[in-house]
Every structure is written in structure tokens, then in C-alpha cells.
């Protein structure tokens, strides 16, 4: 089965007098985080139950700093499913291992809005310049709100995992349908 490691990347900010201290997004305290973890667990179970291929969803790991993220990125999984809530860029970069598959999930309407819904493209993927700069990721690896979109990506990655490194016999030579 395809081993999927879900990760909730977040940061809780402390109140600071006479300044703007709240982060952008909908996760502001431990209660919000607990509710989000529960929401993610339910959504992942529903998605896994609907999958028609072998999938092993590992327990959700919360990460709040780059050191934790780097350790998780090296873990024993095929796909890292990153819930990019409101963590720093350094955390997301540490979670992304170019040698493994990564899918970023962000919320706009399906729960508390995530900061990275607003800035994933310009800050994470493009690094505030015109060219893409995040190794191992592009805009097609970012999913907004839709677990059906995650599931078809996981289905494709499962097929790829089960094909890579295998011998394939093509009778009459390799080919497909159509002209040419």
C-alpha cells in the first residue's frame, strides 16, 4: 500500500501589547489546533475508506519548527501530505523532500482558512520571484479544500510506485492508440 504521512504545519503566536500579533488565518490557539487535528483525522478516514487502492494513512504529526519538519521529511513514507496552516516558510521548505512525493493541502472554505492558501504560490513555490524555486513541487501539487483532488493524486502516485523499477513486456513493441 501507499504510505501517506499527514503533517499539520502551524505556529501559535503570543499576544503582544500595542501591536498586531495575530496571524492571518483561522488557527489562533490550542483549541483551534485540537479541532483542526480532529477534522483532519475524520476527513482522512473518509478519504481512505473511499480509496479503491491500498493506502496506509499514518498518524497525523503536528510540526511547529524546521527541525521537527526535517525529521518528518526523512520518515518512512511514500507521500507527505502537508496541511500548510500558518507555519513559517522554513518549516514548509524543511518538510519538502525532493526525493519523495509531497502534496500541499490548504483550506479556504472547508474549515478555518489557512495562511498558505493566500501565499503558497508567491512565497513557497516562487520564492517571491518570477521563476519556480521550490525543488520537488509545483502548482499542481497544491490542493485547495477538495479531498477528491488529493485522492486522484494519491491514486496516480500509487500506480507510479507500483510501476517504477518494474520490467514491462510489450508484445509487438511499445505503442498506444492513435496516429503514429
Question: For each predicted feature, which ranges?
Answer:
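An N-terminal assembly and electron-transfer interface module characteristic of large anaerobic redox
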Residues: 1-180
